[in-house]
Design a protein with these regions (language model features):
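The conserved beta1-alpha1 loop
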Residues: 63, 71-78
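Cap/lid segment of the alpha/beta-hydrolase catalytic domain
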Residues: 76-148
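Extracytoplasmic/secreted proteins, especially bacterial periplasmic and envelope-associated proteins
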Residues: 4, 8, 88, 145, ...
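N-terminal cap/lid segment of alpha/beta-hydrolase-fold proteins
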Residues: 21-67
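Short alpha-helical segments and helix-capping/turn motifs at coil-helix boundaries
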Residues: 45, 56-59, 83-89, 175-176
């Protein structure tokens, strides 16, 4: 049963029966980022800050086009760097009227690399995904770091009634997130 599998996966990732329902911790609207100043059909960039367990945070940029088609693309970059590496892809989506929410993998790009106090070890700076194993417990799965920013960003974007459909694409590790996340959240249609 598909719903049963979805519920099991949600329970495994978040240790609850539902995906996160909250909104971003911080929303900065109409920011300036020189790296994207040459974009065409760009109305504004909003920066979402999503704070998670153990002090990890995720920074998401929402690129809004001047002329939009009512659809949103969640674009997830992979392990090679932040979503700046997908600049040409983001521009292509903007050219076609999509609002683009751009994500980087945890600990990469604009996302932080916190120092976390580990029992019996001490303070450790987290900068690689394989360190997440030290955070696993019966009450916490580090898998949530990969999917919580997607859920919270969708919660925020869903408050805008002008969006008709949510789509998702990704590269490398972002492609993996793109394969898994739509099975958890039926708001993603393609």
């Amino acid at each position: 049963n598909l719903n049963e599998k979805r519920n099991q996966l949600i329970q495994f990732i978040w240790k609850t029966n539902t995906i996160p329902k909250q909104l971003p911790n911080l929303i900065d609207t109409n920011i300036s980022d020189e790296r994207f100043s040459n974009f065409s059909n760009l109305k504004q960039i909003d920066r979402l800050t999503i704070e998670m367990e153990h002090g990890l945070s995720s920074i998401v940029y929402v690129f809004s086009p001047e002329n939009h088609n009512g659809n949103v693309i969640l674009y997830h970059q992979g392990h090679s760097g932040g979503f700046i590496n997908g600049k040409s892809t983001i521009q292509k989506f903007l050219d076609n009227g999509f609002t683009v929410a751009a994500f980087s993998m945890p600990l990469i790009g604009l996302n932080n690399q916190p120092i976390i106090e580990l029992e019996n070890i001490g303070e450790v700076k987290f900068f690689k995904h394989n360190q997440f194993v030290y955070l696993e417990s019966e009450n916490f799965s580090s898998m949530s770091y990969f999917f919580t920013p997607l859920s919270i960003t969708l919660n925020y974007l869903s408050t805008n009634s002008s969006f008709e459909n949510f789509h998702m694409v990704g590269i490398s590790g972002g492609g993996w997130a793109t394969t898994v996340y739509p099975s958890l959240d039926t708001r993603i249609t393609k």
